[in-house]
A protein has these predicted regions:
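Low-acidity, Ser/Thr- and Arg-rich intrinsically disordered low-complexity segments
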Residues: 2-7, 13-18
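A glycine-rich, Thr/Ser-enriched phosphate-binding loop motif common to dinucleotide/cofactor-binding enzymes
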Residues: 15, 19-29
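Catalytic-loop motifs flanking and including active-site residues across diverse enzymes
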Residues: 22-23, 58, 214-219
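Glycine-rich phosphate/diphosphate-binding loop of Rossmann-like nucleotide-binding domains
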Residues: 31-134, 138
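Short, conserved loop/helix-junction motifs that constitute active-site signature segments
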Residues: 36-37, 67, 166-175, 202-203
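Rossmann-like adenosine-cofactor binding region
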Residues: 92-197
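Adenosine-phosphate binding glycine-rich loop
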Residues: 171-248
Length: 248
């Protein structure tokens, strides 16, 4: 059902994108093991933010990774907030290989319906990020300023895309696991209108910090794997040696 190697997407002959976030560790622990993830519904949804240009790594990581666990993944966003098509194709291929489901919708409520996990987070459209990269490469500050103004106006059209108490009631038994990579745009706390209601965020603050606590281990693992040719062998040798670190 699950392939253990890091998630990598060849997005073009000259660029490979690796996404290895702490997401799986958190949900594996929360649901009591990898074997309990199959069939769980995940709602990866766009959410309103008063800022623009947030990265695509989270939605792409979720649809690319969670479909490898046999999970039912729904990607929801307003028209025009598409992620990289190559990553969507990875998700579809994972469905064929691991018996997962991948669905797209322009309805946040549809995605939240009976979901076991919800991940409402803002991101910028992939096309806009491509445009911004070109403008920065050209040193076109006027173009960058115009793009920012346009994207902020685009975001403002979708303020109803927020993780509210009413939206959470649509989830499975009204108790889906709320996830966010942090920091979140919290309505009434960090901003006037944002990704999530203050009451929802506050209720999930403990699991949110547990999720964040896995990041150092993931970073260490990525550094280790980039420096060692055969990481599995090295780890097995260390385990077999049964040596203990000495404190001086």
């Amino acid at each position: 059902m699950f392939s253990p190697e890091p998630f990598a997407v060849m997005v073009a002959p000259s660029r490979t994108m690796f996404i290895v976030p702490p997401l799986p560790l958190h949900v594996i622990h929360y649901f009591g093991g990898v074997e309990n993830l199959k069939g769980k519904k995940v709602a990866m949804t766009w959410a309103y933010s008063p800022s623009y240009g947030k990265p695509l790594s989270v939605p792409q990581g979720v649809i690319g990774l969670f479909t490898r666990f046999g999970m039912d993944v729904t990607l929801a966003h307003p028209e025009g907030y598409d992620v990289m098509p190559e990553v969507e194709e990875v998700a579809r291929k994972n469905c064929e290989k691991y018996g997962s489901k991948f669905h797209k919708t322009n309805s946040m409520a549809e995605a939240f319906k009976d979901a076991d996990i919800v991940y409402p987070k803002s991101w910028a459209p992939f096309a806009a990020m491509e445009e911004r990269t070109k403008l920065y490469s050209a040193g076109d500050q006027a173009g960058i300023d115009a793009l920012e103004k346009r994207l902020l106006a685009q975001n403002a059209e979708h303020k109803d895309w927020a993780c509210t108490e009413e939206m959470m009631k649509l989830t499975k038994d009204g108790k889906a696991l709320y996830m966010h990579c942090l920091p979140a745009d919290i309505t009434g706390l960090s901003c006037k209108e944002g990704e999530v209601d203050n009451s929802v965020f506050d209720r999930y603050i403990v699991p949110l910090y547990k999720e964040a606590s896995y990041k150092p281990y993931i970073i260490a693992a990525m550094i280790f794997m980039s420096q060692v040719k055969d990481p599995v062998k090295v780890l097995m040798d260390l385990d077999a040696a049964d040596s203990h670190r000495k404190l001086h």
